[in-house]
């Protein structure tokens, strides 16, 4: 515990909050261009082929972002919208690609949680 004199000489330092998505530079989303689209495998207890893309953002950063949902239409030079949010079992993947925005198509035949996957409301058959 510091004395009053010690506090007068050197005040307490504020705790600086570190951003979990520094490449977005305090923006909610950023536009970017896909430089590589590929699949990768998750960490130990899980097993899959997760779809990811390396994206060069308008902020100048190059990040790895996750393509969520079943199936996608992304390839090299696709323009995408990137948001924050990490994937726990993929090391180094701290961003998501927004489905249904710019060149990214929404998930086809999706009926539940459609807004997260950029899918329009299906036509009701009478």
From Swiss-Prot:
One GO cellular component term noted in the UniProt record for this chain: small ribosomal subunit
Modified sites of kind 3-methylthioaspartic acid: 89
UniProt KW keywords: Methylation, Ribonucleoprotein, Ribosomal protein, RNA-binding, rRNA-binding, tRNA-binding
GO-annotated molecular function: rRNA binding; structural constituent of ribosome; tRNA binding
GO biological process: translation
Gene3D superfamilies (alphabetical): Nucleic acid-binding proteins (2.40.50.140)
UniProt keyword Transmembrane helix present: no
Alphabetized InterPro entries for the sequence: NA-bd_OB-fold, Ribosomal_uS12, Ribosomal_uS12_bac
Record's keyword annotation contains DNA repair: no
Function comment: With S4 and S5 plays an important role in translational accuracy. Interacts with and stabilizes bases of the 16S rRNA that are involved in tRNA selection in the A site and with the mRNA backbone. Located at the interface of the 30S and 50S subunits, it traverses the body of the 30S subunit contacting proteins on the other side and probably holding the rRNA structure together. The combined cluster of proteins S8, S12 and S17 appears to hold together the shoulder and platform of the 30S subunit.
Subunit-structure text: Part of the 30S ribosomal subunit. Contacts proteins S8 and S17. May interact with IF1 in the 30S initiation complex.
Homology family: Belongs to the universal ribosomal protein uS12 family.
HAMAP family to which the protein is assigned, alphabetical: Ribosomal_uS12_B
Protein name according to UniProt: Small ribosomal subunit protein uS12
Organism from which the protein derives: Sulfurimonas denitrificans (strain ATCC 33889 / DSM 1251) (Thiomicrospira denitrificans (strain ATCC 33889 / DSM 1251))
Gene label: rpsL
